[in-house]
Amino acid sequence: MRNSQEVKRFIIQVKNHIISAFIKSWQVLSEHRWLKYLTLSIASVILLSSIGFFFIIYGGGLIVDEKKMVLPATTMVETTDGEYAGRLYTENRLLTSLSDVPDHVLTAFIATEDERFFSHAGVDFRSVLRAVYKDIIALDKVEGASTITQQLSKNLFLTNDQSWMRKTKEVMASMYLERNYTKNDILELYLNQLYFAHGVYGIETASQYFFSKAVSDLTVTEGALLAGMIKGPNIYSPYINEENAVARRNVVLNQMHRAGYLETEELLQLQGQGLGVTSQPEAAPLYIDDYLEVVIQEIESRYNITRDELQRGGYRVTVHMDLDMQKQAYEHVTNTAYYQASNDEVEASVVIVDKVTAGLKAVIGGRDYTIGQAHHQALVTHQPGSTIKPLAVYTPALEKGYHPYSLLNDEQKDFDGYTVRNANNQYEGDIPLVEALVESKNTTAVSLFNAIGIETGKEYLNRLNLSTKDDGLAIALGGLSSGYTPVQMATAYNTYLNEGVYRDSSAVISITDRNGVAISSIEPTETQVFEKQSAWYTLNMLERVVTDGTASSYDYAGALAGKTGSTQHATVEGATKDAWFIGLTPDFTVSTWIGFDQSDDAHYLTKGSSQAVQLTKALLTDINQIQLIRSEFDRPSGVEDLPEPITLPEITDLNASFGLGGFNLLRAELSWSTSIDDRIIYHVYEVTEDGKKLIGKTTGEGSYTIKRPSILQMTRYYVEPINPLTNQGGNLSNPAMLSLFE
């Protein structure tokens, strides 16, 4: 306790002495005003210098924006077999790890740009003094002394002006980086952010661009060429000026020799080599953009990654694209020979959906589409016309108990003021459902839609991701206020290939971030929309559309089913607004649409859906030459094939005669020529006073036995062929007369 009090007294005495000394000193300075001002000036300079020094040393954090140290990186899009499918970027940069860069490449950059990189703390003061001396001599800022860290700081956080203030900020940022990051961190970031001309950023991208190889495979001379380019990328690019590139590369090799990285003999040998660059890579093919736009929009919606982030984030995306199909689809869409329209501004879209995965194998959004354009025709809605009939009417009717050979009435009808006519204004009376679909009858479609119920049809559309707010019978003919996209239509029709199961289509299979971490997404839905028998019957009927119906024009040798569709132009009589064909092969579904961005008096099609049929069949023919499309559809287990149609014969040779039966009883035999179709049922009639009377039936046979014929009078007989599929009868045969006495 005593010692503590003594310490306190000592401290108080020292404080009093200091205060006394300060007062005496100030009195002396007051008597000599010049000395007071000099002392204050020196103290101010020391104080300000100290503040400035500590601000430079520790103020770099105010300049460094760590968000900018996350470099924009190219998102790579590739197919399932690893083929390059496209790139998305703001800066074309493939990031690499420092461990992947060979030592001889690192030494090329260090020897050229910052020989003392591993020994300084961000600023090389020896180089600074040399540069300051030259600046003073020239009375201007003529030489830089930037280290690799300073270059990185300038490129990431500052501008390119040559002011002392910018240089001070550069020093501050560099010293901050050196205190907070390792040399390897700085060097890796530096190599990844460099620009190499031609829109190429980062050493990995440059390696692939100039040499078609990974940075890990670069040779000494190749690394030297890249190291030399960064001083003036456009000046030293081998694709712009080969002579400059060689000279600059040799300068770098000399620097490596001077720094002790190369022996003299090795230097001379390397300087004698050519540049070894590959042919300058071509720009991305035009046919890729259409698909990449679908990828971007899908990732935005399913993965919640914005377009900007996708173009900066360095993701790796695997897609369902088939490059051959995509190219073929593009070449056919851009071929003007298929189009018959009022002018050459006509547009088209083709979408191909894989049967098994529902993956988008090809998507063309227009004849000249580029990423970001508003009118991607594969993603824009169009009125579907008659392509909606199977989806909203005929297959739902099969689900509700109708059969492909159920009879429907084909005649002009009026439904509370809504008059329905066939496109050709021809009517056939009662016809089978399958025939109504094959011939794309409007009257039967609307009548059947009315019979099963509008809400029933809409329910099936909704389950096929084809919801509509419309409520009228016009839905049955595709007369919608909005419509559907070619992607939606191809996806919906793909259900017929999959036993009635609807699967959401998609372009993206998987996506990983720049660190290789997989990003989860919303799983596509799978819904049993139709019974597999209904789906199979519909597929069979759609095959007949191609062989015998509205899609029978033009040739295609493979298995093909499909449905045509067209919509009327609103103002030009007889013109078409939208032309469709949805085709199904055993392996995939293809949706083709032809029309205009805006349809008006000057923009219309002069021909209907046949031009979409022509384009599709030509496309399939070319695809089949590249990769064989299977020749038969997969029949599901436990289903029946659609029966072949029956043509009833004209019977003109009915004959009647007597013969002996058992126990010598008299009998009569009727005979006639039969059809080769043994499914036909033959009704046998006997004419009586009350008219004709059905006395028997036989199936597939050309004879009938009358066991107890009348022998006392002449009897007349007829035969009528019956179609068992529709229960329709044909024409009566010629009469056959039977009499024992004549």
Indicate residue ranges for each PLM-predicted region.
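Mid-domain, small-residue-enriched loop/turn segments at the edges of structured enzyme/sensor domains
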Residues: 419-421, 453-491, 500, 504
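Soluble, non-transmembrane domains of envelope/secretory-pathway proteins that act on or interact
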Residues: 1-2, 17-24, 30, 254, ...
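Juxtamembrane regions of bacterial inner-membrane/periplasmic proteins
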Residues: 2-334, 338, 360, 674, ...
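A penicillin-recognizing enzyme superfamily signal
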Residues: 319, 323-339, 363, 370-374, ...
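Short active-site loop at a secondary-structure junction
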Residues: 94-99, 344-347, 371-391, 404-407, ...
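Active-site SXXK
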Residues: 108-110, 256, 329, 358, ...
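Conserved catalytic neighborhood of penicillin-recognizing serine enzymes
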Residues: 137-161, 402-457, 472, 502, ...
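Short, well-structured active-site flanking segments
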Residues: 118-127, 203, 263-265, 371, ...
